[in-house]
Swiss-Prot record:
Family stated for the protein in its record: Belongs to the argininosuccinate synthase family. Type 1 subfamily.
Family matches, as CDD domains: ASS
Places the protein is found: Cytoplasm
InterPro entries: Arginosuc_syn_C (IPR048268), Arginosuc_syn_N (IPR048267), Arginosuc_synth (IPR001518), Arginosuc_synth_CS (IPR018223), Arginosuc_synth_type_1_subfam (IPR023434), AS_cat/multimer_dom_body (IPR024074), Rossmann-like_a/b/a_fold (IPR014729)
Protein name: Argininosuccinate synthase
GO cellular component, one term: cytoplasm
Top-level taxonomic group: Bacteria
Residue numbers binding L-aspartate: T122, N126, D127
Record keyword Amino-acid biosynthesis present: yes
Family annotation (Pfam families): Arginosuc_syn_C, Arginosuc_synth
GO molecular function annotations of the record: argininosuccinate synthase activity; ATP binding
Record-linked PROSITE patterns: ARGININOSUCCIN_SYN_1, ARGININOSUCCIN_SYN_2
EC number: 6.3.4.5
């Protein structure tokens, strides 16, 4: 690969990407364009601009964009229509953000005449795969620079030494130490590294940044109502809101009640196991509510088929294949299933849990007349069950007879 002349860097303003910025300038001698995305991580982003300028980036080469609405509307909500969770637990908060960041990197590269993009993902993790598969899916000719796979800064200690030698400020956590490896957006916050690398050690409470300890949450439950239209949340307690505003509001409820904490050892796409602390307060509430409205609006056959493809759909997102044809095919099926997923769900929030306690819809398939234990006025003839059972039992009876005959 020929040396790039201009590179667009996914830049957070944090330690790793600031070091990468400096490294690109010195190692490649190239012009650097920075892209900083506001995905709802809750940080003031202007310091990233000032830090980039301090490191020699021209003002016209600094891109800071609020893409929260696009993130939730076009990435988070489609994923939640699928009830997607990786390995039964993880809400894919980091995974789902990477395709959008890659999309903007490629678009900015094309707009500024850059011939390469760069990211701060390590050579051990999943993010390198997600960034690069997404970039190549959108522009097959783009060059990608992954410093962690090239440089000799092979540990966090060497990284800190490089930062000190180049006068790059090093952030500290609230205990005065170098912070955990943290990723955050509107959907979640993840923390990895340091004491968390020992899966036997209980995560200290100070690791959790987004939620109160459930034991310290209010002693009284709170009830909220979430309204859905075609599988997407559109209102809370009757108040219509934009996608990003809905997730922001649900995060506030979840934070208050200690909802959405996960201590998880996952199987990375690259082959190793990794332990992380995840917090998705609004995501947990949204998933519970979406499942609640599907319970009365989704046909059983459609629902069971949808459940069967969910693990594959979640795996595709986790592994970085958002822009793959198979993900898009599954998305079309999932979206078709959501045509009647419209209605309202009441959710109880209490000390770390979000539980559906009521649901109603004009599109409901629930028939009280059929299911009642009381007189059903002829809605259902219980004698019909006899033939249903006999037909479904036929193959089992034939198998039993064969097994009795042939030992």
């Amino acid at each position: 690969m020929s040396a790039p002349k201009k590179v667009v860097l996914a830049y957070s303003g944090g330690l790793d990407t600031s070091i990468i910025l400096k490294w690109l300038q010195t190692e490649y001698g190239c012009e650097v364009v920075t892209f900083t995305a506001d995905l709802g991580q809750g940080e003031e982003l202007e310091p990233a601009r000032k830090k980039a300028e301090l490191l020699g980036i021209k003002p016209e080469n600094i891109f800071i964009e609020d893409i929260r609405e696009e993130f939730v509307r076009d990435f988070v909500f489609p994923m939640f229509r699928a009830n997607a969770v990786y390995e039964g637990l993880y809400l894919l908060g980091t995974s789902i953000a990477r395709p959008l960041i890659s999309k903007r990197l490629v678009e900015i590269a094309e707009a500024t005449g850059a011939d390469a993009v760069s990211h701060g993902a390590t050579g051990k993790g999943n993010d390198q795969v997600r960034f690069e598969l997404s970039a190549y899916a959108l522009n097959p000719d783009i060059k990608v620079i992954a410093p962690w796979r090239e440089w000799d800064l092979t540990s966090r200690t060497k990284l800190l030494e490089f930062a000190e030698a180049n006068q790059i400020p090093i952030a500290k956590d609230k205990r005065g130490e170098a912070p955990f490896s943290v990723d955050a957006n509107l959907l979640h916050t993840s923390s990895e590294g340091k004491v968390l690398e020992d899966p036997a050690e209980m995560a200290p409470d100070y690791v959790y940044q987004r939620t109160v300890n459930p034991e310290d949450a209010p002693n009284e439950p709170e009830f909220i109502e979430i309204t859905f239209e075609k599988g997407d949340a559109v209102a809370i307690n009757g108040e219509a809101m934009s996608p990003a505003t809905i997730l922001t509001k649900l995060n506030e409820y979840g934070r208050k009640h200690g909802i959405g904490r996960l201590d998880f050892v996952e199987n990375r796409f690259v082959g190793m196991k990794s332990r992380g602390i995840y917090e998705a307060p609004g995501g947990d509430i949204l998933l519970e509510a979406h499942r609640g409205i599907e319970q009365i609006t989704l046909d059983s056959g459609a629902g069971h088929l949808k459940d069967s493809i969910m693990p594959r759909y979640a795996e595709l997102i986790y592994n970085g294949f958002w822009y793959s044809p198979e993900r898009e095919m599954l998305q079309a099926l999932i979206d078709e299933s959501q045509k009647h997923v419209t209605g309202t769900v009441r959710v109880k929030l209490y000390k770390g849990s979000a539980k559906t306690v009521g649901r109603w819809s004009e599109h409901s398939l629930y028939s009280e007349a059929h299911v009642t234990f009381e007189e059903d006025a002829g809605a259902y003839d219980q004698k019909d069950a006899q033939g249903f059972i006999q037909l479904n039992a036929l193959r089992l009876k034939l198998l039993a007879a064969r097994n009795r005959r042939v030992k």
